[in-house]
Each structure stands twice: as structure tokens, then as C-alpha cells.
Amino acid sequence: MLSLEPLSRPVLDSSQTLLVIFLLAFTRQNSIFRYLSIPVLTFIVKEQITQPPAVVENFHQWLNESSVPFNYLHHINILALTSIDLRNDNNGVLPGLFDRIKSAFIYQLNPRGVGTRYQVKNIPPVPEYYKKRKGYLSQRYRFVVRQLCLFVWQYLIVDVGCSLWHNLPDQERFALFGPGTEWNIINAGPQQWKVRLMAAMIFWTTARNAVDLSHRLGSAVLTGIGATSVHEWPPMCGSLRDAYTLRNLWGKWWHQQLRWTLSSHSNFVTRRLLKLPRRSLLERYLNNAIVHVFSAFIHVNGWRLAGIPDGYIGPSLFYMSFVGGYLVEDFVQHIWATLFRSRSRTSTGIFFERLTGIFWVATFLTVTTPWWIYPLLRREHSFALPVSLVESVGMNNALAMIGVGAFILKTRFDANI
């Protein structure tokens, strides 16, 4: 079979991008050429997956490489499933060539569909800070300053999280995260549950800020040079206060980068192929299952790139466990609403519901997160940030800087800390 050398990887990546831009800009919705491109895109992604770099040296390189399967699914979505049509505007007029190429390029980099008719729901709004505060700086440059300050603060949080992992002695690492410890739930003692809780908290805090770094920096640069506007960059993640159910954890708090694409693929299976009734229980939970299967595949590819030999089963079960979690959650909510409908609408009832929900989500993540991350934590070496501030200033000073930074960001920039 035809095989491309590893040195041609930039050619593969650029060919994929140019092909999708060309098809979006020059072909109509449901064009035969779009469907004929699917085998070509499949061949390209196969080559990308089987010919990764020999060494994945840092977090950003790992993130780019692990997103290869998602990029493929996203391209299939915008070309064939959602089938974006850039050759017609709302008035049936053919837009200019430059506008179509620009829109095609943006759709590739905009998996949340921000500013389009396909924008996913529950994306956080642009902060009110930009409307309330006025001064000698324009809205654009206030946005740039705020984003850069948040970038530095979040970078420091990620640096602290990575350093806590790097500085752990190998003997202690093996004792805490050794093979099989992620599955020790029933017989786990208080110390093991404490480790599970701390590992989950540190991981989710680090990951939450890590996924935001490129968004903060990219938005600051592009808006600073005038290529984009403030309102094209809603926050990547929502408020932790909304994460009182498992559905809200993914649908409101976490980033929505995968939602449009994976939902389009799952709807294709359930509605077009199986022709299940919309909003039926079977369609709903089968959609959930398909989305999480795709998500598991994407993240397992990331663990493969990281060189984790035992990192396949855990991440897969972690994502699939949420389907069972949704079933339990929906059943309990239905029973609660049926028995205590009037009482649950009071402010006290809502507070109790959300407090109980937060405890439920925290417990679920404490149980399941180690399935995903313990294989990673067992590694002696990990990806490094380009520059470690913790190595320069020390852990205690870094933690103090995070605390002071949080106060400044909250009071000066009205940031959602």
C-alpha cells in the first residue's frame, strides 16, 4: 500500500487543511466531491496516526498530535454531516471568493461554531467586564491585557500541577499510583481515598487551566492585531458552580470543543442510519454512548502518543462510565422531582439540590478519574512546559503568586476564578 515517509508530515497536514478549505469554498452542500474526499481524508489521518513524531517533547506538541483523530471527525462533520454551504448567504447570493475562503478557514479552527448558526449551546457569554469598564484603553486592548494576565496566571497553575507530579520520588510514585491501584475501590483505605481525591483535584485543576492556555494567548494576539474582535472569543470554559450534575460538568463547565462534531456523528448513527425517534430514551442514551466512545478513542490516542503501555482500558472505561452515571443521575432527578416538586423550587430546595449534586459529581470523579490518569502518573518522566517558573521561584513562592494573582484578577478584571 502507498506509504509516505515521516519527513512528509508537514505536507500531509497542509494538504488536509487546503483540501477542506477548497471543498468548503468551491463546492455546494451535498456535493459529490465532498463525499469523494472522505477516502482521501481517511488515508491522510491514517498516515498521521501511524507516523507520529519519534519523540513528543512537550505538552503543546502532545496536544496537537493527540487532536489528529478529532480533526478528521470535524472535517467529516463540516463537509458531509452538517455540510456547511458557503456558496449561499441568507439572501441566496453567492458571496465573494475571499469571503468564502476566509469562512472556510475559520470553520476549520472553530469547532464550537462560535458566531455561526451552528454555535453549540451553553457557551459562556463574553464577560460583562468589557461593557462595564471604561477608561483610556479601548475595549480591544483591555481584552488583550486581561487575556494576557489570565494566561500568565493559568500558566503558573499548570506549572505548579506539573511540578507536583515531576518532583514526586519514584518510590512514592509507585506506592501511590502503582499498577492496579486505580481499580482498588472496595478495599481502599482512608489513605488511598485521600490520594484518589487529591489526584483528581490536582488533575482537573491543572487540565482546566491547560486547555485554556492556547485560547487565551491566541485570542490576545489575533485581537491585538485587529484580525478578530472581542466578541469572537467567548470563554473556553464555564463556571464551576454549574458543575452540580455530570451533564453540566461536560455541557456547561468543561470546554465545548468536541460537542458539535461528536454530536453530529452520533446523530448520524441514531437518526439517519437507525432512524430512532427523536427525544426517545433509546435515542438519547445511545447518543450519549456514541459520543463518549468517540471521546474515549480521541483521548486513548493521546495516551498512546505519551508512550503509556497500559493506558487504553482505563481511559475507555472512564468515558463510558458517564453513560451509566447519566442513567443514575436522570433516574434520581426524576424521582426527586416527582416526590418533592413544590419543595424543590424554593431557594432552600435549590441550594440543597445543588449541594447534593456537587457531592455526587465529586464522588463520581474521585472514583473514576484514577482509571484515566493513574497510568499517566506512573510515568517517571512527563511533558514539560517550555519554561518552568516554579523551578525559578520555588513552589511556595509560586503558590503565593497564584493567590495574589487570583485576588488581582478578581478585583481588577472581574475574572471568574
From Swiss-Prot:
GO biological process, one term: terpenoid biosynthetic process
Reactions it catalyzes: chrodrimanin A + acetyl-CoA = chrodrimanin B + CoA
GO molecular function: acyltransferase activity
Associated pathway: Secondary metabolite biosynthesis; terpenoid biosynthesis
Topology in the lipid bilayer: Multi-pass membrane protein
InterPro entries per record: Wax_synthase_dom
Ranges that cross the membrane: 308-328, 357-377, 389-409
Primary site of residence: membrane
Keyword vocabulary terms for this entry: Acyltransferase, Glycoprotein, Membrane, Transferase, Transmembrane, Transmembrane helix
Glycosylation sites: N64
EC number: 2.3.1.-
Keyword Glycosyltransferase: no
Biotechnology: Compounds in the chrodrimanin family such as chrodrimanin A or verruculide A exhibit strong inhibitory activities against protein tyrosine phosphatase 1B (PTP1B) and therefore, they could potentially be developed into drugs for the treatment of type 2 diabetes or obesity. Furthermore, chrodrimanin B, the end product of the pathway involving chrodrimanin A or verruculide A, does not exhibit the PTP1B inhibitory activity, while it functions as a potent blocker of insect GABA-gated chloride channels.
One of the record's GO cellular component terms: membrane
Location in or out of the cell: Membrane
Annotated family: Belongs to the wax synthase family.
Main function: Acetyltransferase; part of the gene cluster that mediates the biosynthesis of chrodrimanin B, a meroterpenoid that acts as a potent blocker of insect GABA-gated chloride channels. The first step of the pathway is the biosynthesis of 6-hydroxymellein by the polyketide synthase cdmE. The prenyltransferase cdmH acts as a 6-hydroxymellein 5-farnesyltransferase and produces the hydrophobic metabolite verruculide C. The FAD-dependent monooxygenase cdmI further converts verruculide C into verruculide B.
Protein name: Acetyltransferase cdmC
Organism: Talaromyces verruculosus
